[in-house]
Regions:
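A conserved regulatory-domain signal marking ACT and ACT-like small-molecule sensing domains
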Residues: 6-143
Length: 143
């Protein structure tokens, strides 16, 4: 799920492009199950004909290979995971910090830390290194 980069570990996300039709999600999750790959967080965006399934999984490179072999178009990109306390308003506070730093968030979704049980906001932005630095300097736990 991660890759070492300089002095930290980068969180990896699998993006899968698929037709918006019955059984596709079950097929994707079945492929991952057969490869013994755990889904740690996911969000799906759809349109009338196609969708994008974004996932943080236990082995993104293996998942990508298996899904490509099954005919899916997919790729792996860097994302940021930020652990937050499970309290009302914490997402708003995180987003306000980014807004005040002139950072735009492309999309976000929720996962959770299996060890601590705390929520993890997974999000994508244009400049991951800048955002990581900004959040760490303000006391956030960046994964």
């Amino acid at each position: 799920i991660t890759e070492e980069r300089e002095d930290f570990i980068m969180l990896k996300q699998l993006s899968i492009y698929a037709e918006n039709k019955k059984g596709v999600m079950q097929n994707i999750t079945g492929i991952l199950k057969n490869e013994d790959i755990n889904i740690l967080g996911s969000v799906t965006n759809d349109s009338a004909e196609n969708g994008i399934v974004r996932m943080v999984v236990s082995d993104p490179d293996k998942a990508k290979e298996a899904l490509i072999a099954a005919g899916y178009l997919c790729h792996v990109i860097d994302v940021i995971g930020v652990e937050v306390e499970d309290k009302t308003g914490n997402l708003n506070d995180l987003l306000l910090t980014l807004k005040d730093s002139n950072v735009s968030v492309d999309y976000l979704y929720l996962s959770f830390n299996r060890d601590s049980g705390k929520p993890i906001m997974v999000f994508h932005t244009e400049d991951i290194m800048e955002v990581r630095s900004c959040l760490k300097s303000r006391g956030y736990t960046v994964l």
